[in-house]
A protein has these predicted regions:
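Alpha-helical subdomain
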Residues: 1-111
Length: 111
């Protein structure tokens, strides 16, 4: 999930690269602003809006092992918002892994 312009750009890239699109059922590639297949979800949402996110993930099999991948997300939020997001996903999925990438270095203003 991401902001509208980012999701639309990602959908366009996925559709244009067979290396990526071959992993997704073609019937799930009709929209320009989301991809929602059995194994992959990409949609517009504010990650802090947990009720909306929960609604978008309603059909996901919660018992399956789940990977949540984020990039440059938590560093820009208040610690309480980050904690809320992590706890929210942990409560939705009993078997969840969270992979987070932040562009920081030990000697920068974020480190």
């Amino acid at each position: 999930m991401d902001y509208p312009d980012v999701v639309k750009r990602k959908v366009k890239i996925i559709k244009s690269k067979t290396l990526l699109s071959d992993f997704i059922d073609p019937s799930c590639l009709g929209s320009d602003d989301s991809i929602e297949s059995a194994d992959y979800k990409l949609f517009i949402a504010d990650v802090r809006d947990l009720p909306h996110v929960t609604e978008k993930l309603a059909l996901v099999e919660k018992q399956r092992p789940t990977l949540i991948l984020t990039e440059c997300l938590l560093i820009y939020m208040k610690a309480t918002d980050s904690e809320f997001i992590l706890n929210g996903f942990a409560s939705l999925f009993p078997s969840v892994s969270f992979l987070n990438y932040e562009m920081i270095r030990p000697d920068d203003k974020f480190g």
